[in-house]
């Protein structure tokens, strides 16, 4: 038989590889679906590429590549036999479990056991060879099989590269002993039991003692009494008192000598009278309890805690597992795939996308979007428990709710966050920033006639007026969402807020419990009014005066999108630059009419500002030099730089992003960063352009020589990413001296430049252009604005009346922590998507949302 197997494998030996360092082995998830070794058909791992495939997709890979040898992995879940007393037989070491897979939480480890099975399968005849089979298989095949079975998860490398080291669960957490000594921790007034320290205090989770932490070299910290107590008592776990929030707390294990996780921290704190849901992180340690008379917290209201929510199953009702601070991604994707255009673009084109996917589909954005869309919409991974299972539970007198499993977005997250310093980390992120990041990826990877992100795109008209000359300038820009300021001064309960603030300060000064928190109630109409108010333009250069002057700017909608995203600007920076969230309630309407905000363009009686370019200031020593010299350091909006740096990007990269986007704001600079972050000089210092003496303009002549130069590729990329053709962007940049803001204005005001466009088009044909989005503009779309020129961004203009169909809510004190859930209206009923759980919503908290999604009403 050994000879037979050896001869059988001879034709395939050149295709069987042993995984090398750097090879990623996907043995837990299919590249095209969410099938795993636990699925009915198991998982097939290619012995050449080490990609995993479910039973429905392995044939496609075989036909495309000709690879014939696969390792088939299958995990069987069996209920343990019961003992004489009715309980499960005690667990023994199971030698039949060898796959590095997470245990299915739906099956209690004490009542179920696992058995793993592996075998080689040769296509197309599906000839099977059970493993292990050392005696009969060639040595190379045996080594390759062992290497595949023992290979680590392909995501562990990425996780270890994250800025933030993953914190492990303490081995003491599950069996922690807590003394029943009657200790109750007060909400304020703590101090170390052995000294007078009131900062850096730690609560021992065994006996409830409050002691100070260790001393730091800068003089802060404490006297190390918490560590001394551990050495005397051997009580291992302690929690830092001023870090307790509904999201968790900072926990340290003296025994393991590192920060740890405690999955049972809520129960352990409740033993000493501390309710996590009523806690808020503080910096000074003087208090944590928000209020003595507990108000129902955001966590309970938004998650609809305490209500018996009915789980739902089937197509469109599949949850997404939380990978650890990945809820910002899950909620965003749930909402996007409730939109028909995204469903059609990816799930609707599933077979075409899969058939034309590259050899490594795990690195293809469209493939992974189609996979995620199918996983959420097919209903294949959201099936209700079988009647037999429910009957069995009743017979056993078990009434526990059946867990919804959901799908794991590991492969998708690894791809869309690749190279991004924030999204690739394990930290919580801003769902708004991730949405813009994803739209950027959708546009960069779109090559079809229908770009699903078109439904969000609209044009904003900005009217800037010189306060001295009263002349105006109208410009237009592209945007994808409406950011609404929330004016706290317009709160309907302003008197209550003022009274609360006084009581809070008094309580802090006297170290007394804080009063019940009062949440600001801001009318939505006040938010709209704040959006329409004129804003001052800093450093405004008036072409009428040819000097800097005071200027004001107002914004209106030149077009209305098919879907309007409204973001409430709840997050801000404190005086210490720590991001924080404003505690507010906004009465967001179910129906929204924005028609009164439609742009009107230049009005009768208004006079336009002259179309002049601000002068370029050149130092005298540069004029006299005969060698290359750089211009003065450019003006860079430092507030935008700091905003980007706070996201974790290198400072020099932030400066370049703001510079190359013409100081047009952090959002535009963020898009530049996403497009250039993989370049080798991404974090190198900004190099200001230089000019030869012969290129320097004479003071008495127009500055035309500089315009003859090719515009920077960065500026071209930014404009083409907005949907403008490359030749038109080059024209616009040359006409505006490479100023992005004026180039945008030029594009909108010069739609018909036929002769020059044709000339530029010939040039563009010879230049490399890998922007797939600009190629997509060659396709016509009947749903676009009828009078829209092909050189304009693709927008779907129409009436500005909308109906709310989804909203994303955030719980927590800042974007750096907390939790996201989303509510979506489907088939006339609201549902709540909370990680892997999908249930009918009883009380959708529309007033506490963060991002709201509206669809245009068909009849207006």
UniProtKB/Swiss-Prot annotation:
<feature type="active site" description="Proton acceptor">
    <location>
        <position position="819"/>
    </location>
</feature>
<feature type="domain" description="UBA 1">
    <location>
        <begin position="635"/>
        <end position="676"/>
    </location>
</feature>
<dbReference type="InterPro" id="IPR050164">
    <property type="entry name" value="Peptidase_C19"/>
</dbReference>
<protein>
    <recommendedName>
        <fullName>Ubiquitin carboxyl-terminal hydrolase 13</fullName>
        <ecNumber>3.4.19.12</ecNumber>
    </recommendedName>
</protein>
<dbReference type="GO" id="GO:0050821">
    <property type="term" value="P:protein stabilization"/>
</dbReference>
<feature type="binding site">
    <location>
        <position position="225"/>
    </location>
    <ligand>
        <name>Zn(2+)</name>
    </ligand>
</feature>
<feature type="domain" description="UBA 2">
    <location>
        <begin position="710"/>
        <end position="750"/>
    </location>
</feature>
<keyword id="KW-0072">Autophagy</keyword>
<feature type="binding site">
    <location>
        <position position="192"/>
    </location>
    <ligand>
        <name>Zn(2+)</name>
    </ligand>
</feature>
<dbReference type="InterPro" id="IPR018200">
    <property type="entry name" value="USP_CS"/>
</dbReference>
<dbReference type="Pfam" id="PF22562">
    <property type="entry name" value="UBA_7"/>
</dbReference>
<dbReference type="GO" id="GO:0004197">
    <property type="term" value="F:cysteine-type endopeptidase activity"/>
</dbReference>
<dbReference type="GO" id="GO:0004843">
    <property type="term" value="F:cysteine-type deubiquitinase activity"/>
</dbReference>
<dbReference type="GO" id="GO:0005829">
    <property type="term" value="C:cytosol"/>
</dbReference>
<keyword id="KW-0677">Repeat</keyword>
<dbReference type="InterPro" id="IPR013083">
    <property type="entry name" value="Znf_RING/FYVE/PHD"/>
</dbReference>
<keyword id="KW-0863">Zinc-finger</keyword>
<feature type="region of interest" description="Disordered">
    <location>
        <begin position="755"/>
        <end position="795"/>
    </location>
</feature>
<feature type="domain" description="USP">
    <location>
        <begin position="318"/>
        <end position="857"/>
    </location>
</feature>
<feature type="binding site">
    <location>
        <position position="212"/>
    </location>
    <ligand>
        <name>Zn(2+)</name>
    </ligand>
</feature>
<feature type="compositionally biased region" description="Polar residues">
    <location>
        <begin position="769"/>
        <end position="780"/>
    </location>
</feature>
<dbReference type="GO" id="GO:0006355">
    <property type="term" value="P:regulation of DNA-templated transcription"/>
</dbReference>
<dbReference type="InterPro" id="IPR009060">
    <property type="entry name" value="UBA-like_sf"/>
</dbReference>
<feature type="binding site">
    <location>
        <position position="195"/>
    </location>
    <ligand>
        <name>Zn(2+)</name>
    </ligand>
</feature>
<dbReference type="InterPro" id="IPR041432">
    <property type="entry name" value="UBP13_Znf-UBP_var"/>
</dbReference>
<feature type="region of interest" description="Disordered">
    <location>
        <begin position="611"/>
        <end position="636"/>
    </location>
</feature>
<feature type="zinc finger region" description="UBP-type; degenerate">
    <location>
        <begin position="168"/>
        <end position="276"/>
    </location>
</feature>
<dbReference type="Pfam" id="PF00627">
    <property type="entry name" value="UBA"/>
</dbReference>
<keyword id="KW-0788">Thiol protease</keyword>
<feature type="compositionally biased region" description="Low complexity">
    <location>
        <begin position="781"/>
        <end position="793"/>
    </location>
</feature>
<keyword id="KW-0645">Protease</keyword>
<dbReference type="InterPro" id="IPR001394">
    <property type="entry name" value="Peptidase_C19_UCH"/>
</dbReference>
<keyword id="KW-0862">Zinc</keyword>
<dbReference type="Pfam" id="PF00443">
    <property type="entry name" value="UCH"/>
</dbReference>
<feature type="compositionally biased region" description="Acidic residues">
    <location>
        <begin position="755"/>
        <end position="768"/>
    </location>
</feature>
<comment type="similarity">
    <text>Belongs to the peptidase C19 family.</text>
</comment>
<dbReference type="InterPro" id="IPR016652">
    <property type="entry name" value="Ubiquitinyl_hydrolase"/>
</dbReference>
<dbReference type="InterPro" id="IPR038765">
    <property type="entry name" value="Papain-like_cys_pep_sf"/>
</dbReference>
<keyword id="KW-0378">Hydrolase</keyword>
<dbReference type="GO" id="GO:0008283">
    <property type="term" value="P:cell population proliferation"/>
</dbReference>
<dbReference type="GO" id="GO:0010506">
    <property type="term" value="P:regulation of autophagy"/>
</dbReference>
<keyword id="KW-0833">Ubl conjugation pathway</keyword>
């Amino acid at each position: 038989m050994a000879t037979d197997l050896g001869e059988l494998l001879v034709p395939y030996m050149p295709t069987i590889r042993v995984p090398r360092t750097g090879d990623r082995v996907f043995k837990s998830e299919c590249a095209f679906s969410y099938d795993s070794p636990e699925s009915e058909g198991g998982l097939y791992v290619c012995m050449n590429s080490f990609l995993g495939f479910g039973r429905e997709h392995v044939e496609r890979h075989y036909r495309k590549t000709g690879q014939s040898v696969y390792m088939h992995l299958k995990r069987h879940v069996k209920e343990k036999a019961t003992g004489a007393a009715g309980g499960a037989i005690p667990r023994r070491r199971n030698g039949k479990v060898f796959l590095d897979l997470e245990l299915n939480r739906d099956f209690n480890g004490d009542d179920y056991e696992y058995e793993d099975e592996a075998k080689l399968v040769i296509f197309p005849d599906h000839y099977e060879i059970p493993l292990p089979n050392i005696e009969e298989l060639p040595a190379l095949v045996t080594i390759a099989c062992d290497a595949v079975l023992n290979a680590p998860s392909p995501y562990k490398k990425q996780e270890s590269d994250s800025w933030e080291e993953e914190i492990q669960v303490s081995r003491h957490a599950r069996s922690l002993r807590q003394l029943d000594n009657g200790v109750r921790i007060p909400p304020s007034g703590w101090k170390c039991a052995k000294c007078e320290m009131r900062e850096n205090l730690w609560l021992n989770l065994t006996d409830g003692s409050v002691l100070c932490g260790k001393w730091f070299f800068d003089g802060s910290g404490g006297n190390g009494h918490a560590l001394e107590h551990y050495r005397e008592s051997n009580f291992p776990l302690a929690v830092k008192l001023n870090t307790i929030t509904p999201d968790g707390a900072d926990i340290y294990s003296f025994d393991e000598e590192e920060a740890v996780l405690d999955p049972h921290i809520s129960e352990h704190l409740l033993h000493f009278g501390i309710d996590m849901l009523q806690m808020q992180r503080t910096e000074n340690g003087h208090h944590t309890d928000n209020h003595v008379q507990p108000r129902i917290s955001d966590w309970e209201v938004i998650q609809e805690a305490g209500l018996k929510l009915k789980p739902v199953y089937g197509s469109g009702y599949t949850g997404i597992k939380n990978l650890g601070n990945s809820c910002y991604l899950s909620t965003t994707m749930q909402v996007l795939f409730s939109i028909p255009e995204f469903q059609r673009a990816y799930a609707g084109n599933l077979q075409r996308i899969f058939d034309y996917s590259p050899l490594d589909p795990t690195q293809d954005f469209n493939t992974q979007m189609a996979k995620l869309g199918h996983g959420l919409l097919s209903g294949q991974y959201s099936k209700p428990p079988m009647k037999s299972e429910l009957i069995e539970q009743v017979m056993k007198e078990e009434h526990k709710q059946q867990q919804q499993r959901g799908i794991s977005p590991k492969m998708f997250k690894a791809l869309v966050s690749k190279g991004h310093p924030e999204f690739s980390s394990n930290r919580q992120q801003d769902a708004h920033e991730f949405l813009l990041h994803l739209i950027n990826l959708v546009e960069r990877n779109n090559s079809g006639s229908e770009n699903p992100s078109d439904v969000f795109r609209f044009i904003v008209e900005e009217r800037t007026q010189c306060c001295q000359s009263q002349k105006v300038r109208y410009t237009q820009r592209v945007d994808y969402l409406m950011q609404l300021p929330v004016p706290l001064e317009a709160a309907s309960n302003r008197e209550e807020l003022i009274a609360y603030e006084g009581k809070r300060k008094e309580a802090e000064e006297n170290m007394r419990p804080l009063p019940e928190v009062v949440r600001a109630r801001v009318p939505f109409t006040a938010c709209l009014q704040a959006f329409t108010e004129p804003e001052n333009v800093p450093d405004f250069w008036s072409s009428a005066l040819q000097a800097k002057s005071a200027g004001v700017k107002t914004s209106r909608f030149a077009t209305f999108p098919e879907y309007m995203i409204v973001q409430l600007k709840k997050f801000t920076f404190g005086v210490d630059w720590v991001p924080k969230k404003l505690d507010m309630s906004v009465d967001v309407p179910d129906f929204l009419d924005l028609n009164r905000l439609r742009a009107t363009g230049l009005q009768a009686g208004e006079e336009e500002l002259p179309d002049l370019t601000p002068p370029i200031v050149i130092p005298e020593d540069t004029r006299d030099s005969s060698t290359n010299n750089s211009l003065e350091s450019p003006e860079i909006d430092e507030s935008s730089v700091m905003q980007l740096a706070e996201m974790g990007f290198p400072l020099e990269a932030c400066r370049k992003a703001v510079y190359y986007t013409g100081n047009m704001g952090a959002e535009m600079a963020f898009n530049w960063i996403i497009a250039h972050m993989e370049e080798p000089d991404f974090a190198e210092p900004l190099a200001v352009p230089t000019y030869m003496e012969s290129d320097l303009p004479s003071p008495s002549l127009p500055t035309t020589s500089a315009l003859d130069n090719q515009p920077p590729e960065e500026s071209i990329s930014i404009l083409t990413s907005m949907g403008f053709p490359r030749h038109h962007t080059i024209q616009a940049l040359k006409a505006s001296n490479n100023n992005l803001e004026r180039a945008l204005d030029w594009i909108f005001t010069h739609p018909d430049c036929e002769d020059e466009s044709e000339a530029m088009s010939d040039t563009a044909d010879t230049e490399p252009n890998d922007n797939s989005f600009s190629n997509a503009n060659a396709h016509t779309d009947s749903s676009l604005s009828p009078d829209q020129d092909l050189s304009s961004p693709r927008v779907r203009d129409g009436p500005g009346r909308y109906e709310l169909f989804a909203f994303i809510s955030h719980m927590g004190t800042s974007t750096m922590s907390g939790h996201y859930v989303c509510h979506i209206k489907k088939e006339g009923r609201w549902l709540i998507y909370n990680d892997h759980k999908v249930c009918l919503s009883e009380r959708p908290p529309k007033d506490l949302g963060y991002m709201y999604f509206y669809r245009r009403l068909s009849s207006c």
